[in-house]
Regions:
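Hydrophobic, well-ordered beta-alpha structural blocks that scaffold small-molecule cofactor pockets
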Residues: 2-22, 28-178
Length: 178
């Protein structure tokens, strides 16, 4: 069965599952599971796991498609370099799609971060801390997409802010997010 997602996205997803404790990367004796779950419990856990994996892969596929369209649209508008705002699974996908689309990801702005790197991209606490120039801002904030959109729009103008469709950020007739 073909999932339609790149191996890099699968690897990123597996790492995320391991870090969340959903998947263990070690050999475990087969009988050990009997101590944790009844057969009915194991069946329910399996069903929930399948549901979670299905919805997660759907998110990854939709996010990848949205990011590729968004970067293509940005490229047509002359945007060659962008800053992401909001550290999330969506930001991971945007970094991977940015490489695929030859769009430079200059930095990731995340007010809660204390620096470092995210998939090789510098993490900064504010737009003022971004050291390189950039053409546009991409909202990748899953917790407060509207807040990040409003902040970026006020600072750089609506025409320089890109938002993946799956975030559901829409504009009313006056140009405000609704």
């Amino acid at each position: 069965m073909e999932l339609g997602i790149a191996l890099g996205l699968v690897n990123a997803y597996l790492k995320r599952c391991v870090s969340k404790g959903l998947v263990k990367v070690q050999n475990v004796p087969a009988r050990r599971y009997a101590y944790y779950l009844t057969p009915q419990g194991f069946a329910e856990k399996s069903r929930l796991t399948v549901d979670y994996l299905t919805s997660s892969f759907s998110f990854f596929r939709q996010a990848k498609a949205d990011c590729l369209v968004m970067f293509k649209t940005g490229s047509l508008a002359g945007f060659k370099s962008v800053v992401l705002v909001g550290r999330s699974d969506l930001a991971e996908i945007a970094v991977i799609c940015g490489m695929e689309s030859q769009t430079e990801i200059v930095a990731l702005v995340d007010a809660k971060s204390t620096g470092g790197h995210f998939l090789g991209v510098p993490i900064v606490a504010s737009f003022d801390a971004v050291e390189k120039s950039f053409d546009a801002v991409v909202v990748t904030d899953l917790e407060d997409a509207y807040g990040s959109w409003d902040l970026a729009k006020a600072r750089f103008g609506e025409e320089r802010v890109l938002v993946p469709r799956l975030l559901g950020v829409t504009k009313d007739l006056q140009g405000r997010a609704s």
